[in-house]
Curated annotation (Swiss-Prot):
Belongs to the SKA1 family. The modification Phosphothreonine is found at residue 156. This is SKA complex subunit 1. Residues 131-254 are annotated as: Binds microtubules and protein phosphatase PP1 subunit PPP1CA. The gene is Ska1. Residues 105-127 have a biased composition (Basic and acidic residues).
Length: 254
């Protein structure tokens, strides 16, 4: 019983001490000479909080980079093993490469062979002209520094260029389908091709563009608030322009 009373008294005394501390701190807050100091402390706390958020974003980016590098190393190791295996198991029946030395005396040619040698060589057909797919250029550090702070918020230079990389992936995937012969298309690609054509307007003729559906189709990016903030930054840096119409926003590569 005495032990319980002692614990209760100790608990009550602790609460009283806490109340006294709170009251003393409250009085400090009302002191005009300390208000400026407390305000500065509050500002510093906000600044530290923002720095912690930036550190958190940077740590996430470094973790993603580390994961990608591990996957790359694993892939390279597997390819190296395959090369070593091929090197050790070259089939013996393959012909050996022989180096022939040029002779100063040309052997006599058979008349029939000389006639063949004199026949004109038909010109080769010129290769088909490859269509160039326009991709977005990465932003530079100077351009990133020139973006207003309110626009880029806590985004980093690397995060923006990572999005550009994904946008280029979507652009290349889309226009490879458009340039592909229709006869060789699967039903899925035919449907995509038809959508691409339907999204064209007179303002996008001859220009490369994508819509949000292409981002979802060809990349792992999330079309969220962060994505739209980055698109605004890219428009500010003159990497793209927008053409609206028919309920769609077309992001045109500039």
């Amino acid at each position: 019983m005495a032990s319980d009373l002692e614990q209760l008294c100790s608990y009550v005394n602790e609460k009283i001490e806490n109340i006294k501390k709170i009251l003393s701190l409250r009085k400090l807050g009302q002191d005009p000479t300390l208000k400026t100091t407390l305000s500065k402390i509050g500002d510093e706390i906000i600044t530290v909080n923002e720095l912690l958020n930036q550190f958190e974003l940077e740590i996430q980016y470094q973790e993603q980079t580390n994961s990608s590098l591990k996957e790359l190393c694993k892939s390279l190791e597997e390819e190296f093993k395959d090369v070593e295996h091929l090197k050790e198991h070259i089939p013996s029946h393959l012909p050996q490469v022989t180096v022939t030395q040029s002779s100063t005396h040309k052997p006599d040619l058979d008349p029939k062979e000389s006639v063949k040698a004199e026949e004109p060589v038909l010109p080769k057909k010129p290769p088909k002209e490859q269509r160039v797919i326009k991709e977005m250029h990465f932003i530079t550090t100077d351009e990133f520094s020139g973006v207003p702070a309110y626009m880029k918020s806590r985004l980093t230079y690397c995060q923006i260029n990572d999005v550009i990389k994904e946008i280029n992936k979507a652009v290349v995937s889309k226009y490879k389908i458009i340039h592909q012969p229709k006869a060789s298309m699967s039903s899925v690609k035919r449907n995509l091709y038809q959508r691409f054509i339907n999204e064209e307007t007179k303002d996008t003729k001859g220009r490369h563009f994508i819509v949000e559906a292409d981002i979802k189709e060809f990349t792992t990016l999330k079309v969220d608030k962060k994505f739209h903030v980055i698109m605004n930054i890219l428009r500010h840096c003159q990497r793209l322009s927008e053409v609206r119409g028919g309920g769609l926003t077309r992001y045109v590569i500039t």
